Amino acid sequence: MKKKIALLAGLGLVQSVVLAQTKPTDSVTTLKDVVITSTKNNQKQSQTGKVATILGPEVLDKSYGKTLPQLLAEQAGITVTGATSNYAANKSVFFRGAGSAYAIILVDGIVQNDPSGNGGAFDLRLLPIDQIERIEILRGGQSTIYGSDAIGGVINIITKKGAKQPLNVYGVASAGSYETYKGTIGLQGTVSNFDYNISYTHVKSDGISEAANPVGNSTAFDKDGLKTDGVNAKFGFKFSDNFSINPFVRYNTGTYNYDDGPFADAANFSILKNIAVGTNAVYLLGNGKVTLNYSHQKTSNDVNSAYPALLEGQVNFLDVYYNQQLGKKLDLLLGVDHRDMKLPSAAGSPKTNIFAGYGSLFLHDLSVFNLEVGGRYNKHEQYGENWTYTITPSINLVKQVKLFGNISTGFKIPTLTMLFGTFGANLNLKPEKSENYEAGVEFNFADGKYTLRGAAYKRNLTDAIIYNYPQGYENQVSQKTKGFEIEPAVKLGIFSLNGFYSYTEGDEYNFVDNGVADYLFRRPKHTYGATAGLQATKDLFVSVNYRYVGGRTDGDFNSYPAAVVNLPSYKLLNAYAEYSLAKSRVKLFVDTQNILDEKYNEIYGYNSLGFNVNAGVRFNIH
């Protein structure tokens, strides 16, 4: 560890010696001057050493035929298990091989968490794509800024706010395969110093059978559909040039049908309800700024199966931070956050809290040199105190070439479900800790028309928590992961091409092998993909997406002890077309998925979607 820190310090020395002597595409935006708000000090793409991907309106406006998990699964370094399975199925995000419990989901910069869920992860099925303005993806450890869970990466989902006009009526209506229907209607606008965005979304799908039908079984399995309703309301009050408050309310409810397990049909269903209320407030102080984020989140999951249960989770989150420009080349960030978590439905209504103070110094535009150094102090009610840090340098060797690196530490506290839940709870669990290393290079030529980014990473996770059947949750010795990503992109007038290749390997304990295995469970070593887009005419846009997912190792849990199963690789070919009418106020779209009708299983014993189509119209009237 000391050698690696010394190596990074040596890189900083080289930078000092040198001192002494993201591009638009129709798939991903990586202009060098794009501001990344998830860093909390608004770093530019050209300044930061973090590996960031920005999905802007040019991507999201052409993704209305997809779900959010499907869109995220097309990005480098991210695997979303269940993204192309039945719509009602659970979705799990793997960030560079780290499970969904190690990824932080933000909505408008506010941490989303469900203490009653698997690993405390937020349910991505709750967010409709048509309410999203922008997505910022930060890969690698981010625990210094976002605390527990931010070991694999951060996804910041920025929702739409009021339109410039006093009144704008917008909506989406679509229909597709598996009797899938979606409708959104909304109002947005700005009147004087007040802006608003209010919407209602309804989704219904008959879906497919979640469980695969075993070979030789002549009985047809029933379909496992879903029906969801959601209301989103976001407001902005600008009281002066220096002070604004932005409250929000989100309410989602849905009924999700599911089966008993792999190859096992059942008439199970769960009724999920989620409400989030809170506010953002910003006060400008000369060259400084104070930001406050508060939210109250409550989730309930009424499980109806052979083992009925009511699972409830509650979180109160408060984050206050201060930015100050210390001259033109140095920025200061100081903040505190406090989180209260509770399981109201569990015996004794267990709860816990964690307090943190954090800060960073960001030195930028010092000739070719940029450097961010940060630290975080954490105090947990049960586990006491600990510290994390991050060191992130970058060097712009020439205008077209940037070197970057990162060393950071992270931690994750056991969730309340792990400590007090119904299945396998263990009060003797220890927090998980990680060490993260990253280095890479980025090329940018012809004013962003040609870009190439490559990054290699390594993560060591100690005391990783696993569910070891039948004992329950327990700490394993370690989990080690390493890999690299390559992301080329071309933008030539009306044509764009973006691609990626990701390699991930590691070893971890799993209870299928009942020991440490030299593979990562359900995570492929190799994934690659490409998206080509063409603005064929002023009104017609078309694109094609190809994605390859390598072989994975899973488990057959219908046998005891569970047996190791190898899942073959698969490839997906998708296409999208959009035509604008009435000065782009009306747009017709068609989204086709799995054109080759590939037969595959993301998870052993569960079905995946075959060839499917979603077509519809979206409109803006003002």
Which positions does each model-derived feature cover?
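Conserved C-terminal beta-signal and adjacent last beta-strands/turns
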Residues: 5-10, 14, 20, 188, ...
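Gram-negative outer-membrane beta-barrel transporters
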Residues: 365-367, 458-460, 475-557, 596, ...
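Short acidic/polar hinge/loop motifs at secondary-structure boundaries
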Residues: 111-139
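N-terminal periplasmic accessory domains that precede
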Residues: 68-71, 91-94, 103-106, 122-125, ...
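N-terminal periplasmic "start-of-domain" segments of outer-membrane beta-barrel proteins
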Residues: 33-61, 92
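Outer-membrane beta-barrel signature, preferentially recognizing the C-terminal barrel domain
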Residues: 263-280, 284, 396, 400-402, ...
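Periplasmic-side early beta-strands and strand-to-turn transitions of outer-membrane beta-barrels
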Residues: 156, 164-166, 172, 189-270
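Extracytoplasmic beta-strand/coil segments of soluble accessory domains associated
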Residues: 69, 73-111
